[in-house]
Curated annotation (Swiss-Prot):
The keyword Kinase applies. It catalyses: glycerol + ATP = sn-glycerol 3-phosphate + ADP + H(+). This is Glycerol kinase. ADP binds at T12, R16, T265, G308, G409.
Amino acid sequence: MAKYIIALDQGTTSSRAIIFNHQGEVINISQKDFPQHFPQLGWVEHSPDAIWSTQLSVMQEAIAKARIREHDIAAIGITNQRETTMLWNRKTGEPVYQAIVWQDRRTARYCDTLKEEYGAMIRQKTGLIIDAYFSASKIHWILENVSGARELAEKGDLAFGTVDTWLIWCLTEGKVHVTDPSNASRTMLFNIHTMQWDDELLALFNIPKAILPEVKSSSEIYGYVDSRYIQGGKVPIAGIAGDQQAALFGQMCTKKGMMKNTYGTGCFLLMNTGDKIVTSNNNLLSTVAWKIGDKVTYALEGGVFVGGAVIQWVRDGLRIIRTADAINSLADTVEDNGGVYFVPCMTGMGAPYWDQYARGTIIGITRGTTDAHIARATLEGIALQVHDIVRAMEKDVGEATKEFRVDGGASASNLLMQIQSDIFQFDIVRPKVLETTALGAAYLAGLAIGFWQNTDEIAQQWQQDCTFSPKMPPEKVAHILRYWNKAVKAAQHWIEE
């Protein structure tokens, strides 16, 4: 009997493969970074070939390092950076342009022209706010600006995919062109009520329906990995979820009202809203969490574009630390931020502000400011952005938050988690397994093939590592929040003409 599930976790800065056993324990991890390209101000691109080659490499490397054979692999699950957009020639498999990354802002002005007339309609159909973040305007840009792309599309020879779709296309040698609702719901072309691609939205963005993948559930067999990549050609690809929805599932937030925050490149807070779509009055997004069988689960989401990535900037741009981990020890040498506030909106503000023209701001600097104050303000800036989303979410659901679960690379920082708990004045719960995004994809794949019988069996595997409880006096929190709000106002509309 097969003993393992492999999760392919394709992220914004690296491709990873993680092998899990039946207990949900990590057997092996392989990871490779790949470059991001910034050809113009506000543009962010990846090479589709680099995404595929690094993902294939880490999958094969993980299998080799774990010394397992193809018959030991029960299935593969895929989780991915969402919204990132690729178009390729169906006949040759060659991309017609680079992958336009979710962080890319080139279509901001175009999105602005649509907001007044179409904003309400798009919000009602998709649960999303018109923004360059989502795939629709990126597809439109490629079709309008890349020579030959529109002609290929009209002939039916062009394929669109988010990263999950591209990887499955490559793994199956072009035999399978699919996605799942968690990814489709991030394109701004998918109606989350009918669970179908929406003809009115496709017409608005002038996108031919023929280029789109088939939308299947998040947990079923889509196809098999070609024997060129795993010998035998019998390993099923059986689970798909966008990274944030996968983390919600991996955290076993499977009951209505449960929430998690992922501290990755960005920060993404999701609350399970069950089988009901909660329409936000506070600039949050309604999205599909997953679909298993015929049952659709929805979520309320708030995301900030720069979370853990700001620590990379402090390391590589500001150069006041040599390693990302060093920010914790540096920040811990001071008791507070010394009046310094860092709003790390380098690529604009996401929820709940949705300001495409905001830019990163460090404010409150004096002659007494040190690198340690800036380090602490960096960690606080991450936590305070998350605070603003939680307060918006509480208004939408009419309930106060008592705790939430955390994951992602930066959640390993005890100092950041303590700051987060202090600002919230409620408990932060960190699980033993932080690889919850990959674990969610593994669980979805395993459920499809009977590796696990149901979510109740899986839920028993979730284990708490530690809980962070608030230590900061409420009056000090109020002071921090007052100045944080002033700093946010300073960062807003910075480059608006």
